[in-house]
Design a protein with these regions (language model features):
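Structural and coupling elements of P-loop NTPases
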Residues: 1-528
């Protein structure tokens, strides 16, 4: 129970370039995992960011896959066992939304990073929808306060309107841009003064808002403005209540500058104190409580070649209940066979270390020799199937062909491993037998091509295919389904699970099929 209580497993999510990876790095700095944070600036890497470990990420300065990192952390002034923090740093780039959606099934809470100048952006909106669907509590960090941006109240209004959630500031900025003096920590009633480019220490002052000491620290004008702002904050926004945050009704808001390491420690200190410990997980059969004695877990991500020196696959397993023990036999539910793991690992981005045990909330890396698929369940014998790992209907489609006949084996292996990772979806057209890759954005095609060449020594060629939508289909009457598949043979494909997929080449074809075959159900995600 004690081990469960001290765990905090969360994702950091944002629109591209809001400062998500930089914030992750600074958390690791406070957790003692790294000595210097590598800031991503203007899409060029000043020092390589720890959490962006794949070659293509280092080249382009964007995150294209979820990184998993863990560290122990105890806020200043607290005593006892440290909190065990598990961070999942997700891709901000919109092309990799699906990886982020899957990651949100493995966390108990989330921190959303918002650019103070740009406010709520398209990707922020989408990610918040997924958090709302799963009732995931969120904290919002308004970043880049050291740059000229929008009025803090305007940003808060936009957050409430666009993200459809009530907010409650727990810190408040004093000026911004060139006039940025620091933040007042409402939660701790403490003044934090801003000094640019400090790696670790900021000046903290215990000060009463109504005292003259405040004027001496920030200036009379700024102090008067802060008092006025705080009066408005306390009048407009409800008093903070931890339970309304944990039930995803209210989002606490912090202000700061991740690049300058400002406001980050206050965010982390408050987060570990108020964020939920591991929550129950819904399986198809029943609700699984973390306190249960028997181990259960599910695979939410697979990554090939996490170590370029050893061509290896790692399956990321979220522990849901009980205790995971190295070398213990567990049931692989889908395969119906017993498996053991002699070298389970935990992560600091690309650095990993072997562990002997893990508890609910932990993310464990399991060596994968091809036995895992995303969504697989491990138990001590019980037949359980965890929910909530859908594939979404892709937006873009291309035929993929092997462009180096002598490298056919490498091409097949690379395509299979990338497909198992969930980088993109792969369909086999039943009419002509050709493989079709479906993605949510153009960048995914580039990533597949790059990784096939650099990790598998294989080459691929893309050819255009005109498709509008991929739908998973089902019917209560098997004969009706067979009849549809015969009538629409040229549009039929199979996905990697062998499920029937209807590939419509236009909106008209799709709507006519739905109209003419009313007993067929068309689904736009694979989970139905």
């Amino acid at each position: 129970m004690k081990e469960i209580e001290r765990r905090r497993t969360f994702a950091i999510i944002s629109h591209p370039d809001a400062g998500k990876t930089t914030l992750t790095e600074k958390f690791l700095l406070f957790g003692g995992q790294i000595q210097v944070a590598g800031a991503v600036k203007n899409n060029k890497i000043r020092k390589t960011a720890t959490s962006d470990w794949m070659d293509i990420e280092k080249q382009r300065g964007i995150s294209v896959s979820t990184s998993v990192m863990e560290f122990d952390y105890l806020p200043d002034g607290e005593h006892g066992d440290p909190y065990k923090v598990n961070i999942l740093d997700t891709p901000g780039h919109q092309d990799f939304a699906e990886d982020t959606y899957r990651t949100l099934t493995a966390v108990d809470s989330a921190i959303i990073v918002v650019d103070s100048a740009k406010g709520v952006e398209a990707q922020t909106r989408k990610l918040m929808e997924v958090c709302r669907m799963r009732n995931t509590p969120v904290i919002i960090f308004i970043n880049k306060m050291d740059r000229e941006g929008r009025d803090a109240f305007d940003v808060l209004d936009e957050l409430e309107e666009e993200l459809k959630i009530k907010v409650r500031p727990l810190s408040w900025p004093i000026g911004q841009g060139a006039r940025f003096k620091g933040v007042y920590n409402i939660y701790e009633q403490q003044l934090n003064l801003f000094t640019p480019n400090k790696q670790r220490v900021t000046e903290k002052v215990e000060v009463n808002v109504n005292s003259e000491a405040l004027d001496q620290h920030v200036g009379e004008r700024e102090a008067a403005q802060l008092r006025e702002d705080l009066e408005l904050v306390n009048g407009v926004y409800p008093a903070f209540d931890v339970e309304t945050y944990r039930s995803a009704e209210v989002a606490p808001v912090f202000f700061g500058s991740a690049l300058n390491n400002f406001g980050v420690q206050e965010l982390l200190d408050c987060f570990v104190k108020i964020a939920p410990s591991p929550k129950p997980t819904q399986a198809e059969e029943r609700l699984v409580e973390p306190e249960e004695s028997k181990f259960t877990g599910f695979i939410f991500k697979i990554t090939a070649n996490i170590d370029p020196n050893h061509r290896s696959c790692i399956a990321f397993c979220k522990i849901c209940s009980g205790k995971f023990v190295r070398n213990q036999p567990y049931l692989h539910v889908r395969l119906g066979k017993t498996v053991r793991f002699s070298s389970p690992t935990q992560f600091m981005a690309q650095r990993k270390s072997t562990i002997d045990e893990a508890y609910p909330g932990d993310i464990v890396g399991l060596p994968d020799n091809g036995i895992f698929k995303i969504g697989d369940t491990l138990t001590e014998g019980e037949q359980l199937h965890f929910r909530g790992l859908p594939s979404f209907s892709p937006l873009l489609f291309k035929y993929i062909e092997n462009d180096a006949p002598m490298k056919r084996k490498q091409f097949q292996k690379g395509l299979e491993e990338l497909r198992n990772e969930g980088v993109a979806q792969l369909f086999v057209n039943q009419f002509n037998g050709r493989r079709i890759v479906g993605t949510v954005g153009q960048l995914q095609f580039e990533v597949i091509q790059y990784r096939l060449e650099n990790e598998y020594n294989a080459k691929c060629r893309w050819e255009p295919v005109h498709l509008h939508k991929a739908c998973w289909i089902e019917a209560d009457d098997a004969q009706e389904l067979e009849n549809f598949k015969k009538r629409k043979y040229q549009y039929m494909a199979k996905d990697i699970e062998g499920r029937d997929v209807f590939l419509a080449d236009s909106g008209y074809v799709l709507s006519m099929a739905q109209q003419d075959f009313e007993h067929i159900r068309f689904h736009f995600t694979s989970e139905f």
